[in-house]
Amino acid sequence: MSRFFIKGRIRYEHSFRKTDTGQLSFITNAKDDSRKMIYKMNDKKKEKFMKKIISLLLLVTILFSLIGCSSKKGTITIAVPNDSTNEARALLLLESNGIIKLKEDATITATINDIVENPYGIEFKEIEAAQLPNYLRDVDYAIINSNYAISAGLNPITDSILIEGGGSYYANILAVKDGNQENPLVLALLAALNSRQVKDFIDKKYQGSVVSTVENLTDGYDASIDYSALENQTITVACSPTPHGEILNIAKDILASKNITLDIKEYNDYIIPNTVVEDGTILANYFQHLPYLEDFNKNNNTHIVSVGAIHVEPMGLYGGKQTGLDKIYDQNK
């Protein structure tokens, strides 16, 4: 029986044959006759040799299988916001998609300690909300607020794997210190944000990744306000850059037509915009949803109130090391 194999540019032929003494000869001949190797072994040695080869092949096969399983079944990591209301919001998104289960009495301040079922063995990493896009490369998934996703160049509609509905429970609000709700400057800013111009801008600019929640649209102005008395005055408002700062620029143009200046102060965190309103440095802010504000007031003894909901930013699950949910669902296979 003969076999051929190629090594480099030389074609080899090898064959087994029995000698007159009953030994098995393994003969390898180079096609160019430059080499000839003859290995002789008796039947017992041949059998022992073949068993070793088979055992080695089985061992290699098992090792590769284990490596494959290890890669497939590795721990899944999901990064979530570390502030209480947004962490709860992220966990509720996972629960609504059957990935985890929370305690029955879990509220909008639920944390990972309220998880009662974690069938896929997910490891959670609690990260400051604004930093979540920067952690995508280090985790399998991250749950990110739309404003931070947009700022990082992500499209919440096309890039998210899971996304909230457009309900207004987490609508972003215009907020002021308690006692300033009827301030004419505040009412003028609210009317501008409730305008058809702002809604049209949101619809066109964000294509569903930010959704207006205003039901009673205005022309940009409040008929109860004496705008002439507000001429040459300045409204200060704290916000996050995207989308709040962009939306406020539309309101700025509306107010400018009445000779009112809107001074927009942008911040990249969730703390300062509230502290500057509380201490009176800034008149209003526009960056947060009501559950976050209520929790902030409770924990910081502040007195900030909502004067109106403007838009909602659906929170989404984004892929880091993963591009779909297969890694999660494959855990139980």
Language-model regions, residue ranges each:
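C-terminal motif of bacterial Sec signal peptides marking the signal peptidase cleavage site
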Residues: 65-68
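A conserved helix-loop-strand patch within extracytoplasmic ligand-binding domains
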Residues: 72-87, 91-93, 187, 195-200, ...
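Short, well-ordered beta-strand elements
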Residues: 74-79, 230-242, 260-266, 333
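Extracytoplasmic "Venus flytrap"
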Residues: 83-87, 229-251, 270-272
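Periplasmic-binding protein-like
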Residues: 150-190, 215-223, 307-319
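Short helix-initiation/N-cap motifs at beta->coil->alpha
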Residues: 106-134, 264-275
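Beta->alpha turn/N-cap motifs
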Residues: 128-129, 137-140, 144-150, 241-242, ...
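Ligand-binding clefts/hinges and TM-proximal coupling segments of bilobed small-molecule sensing domains
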Residues: 89, 103-110, 187-228, 333
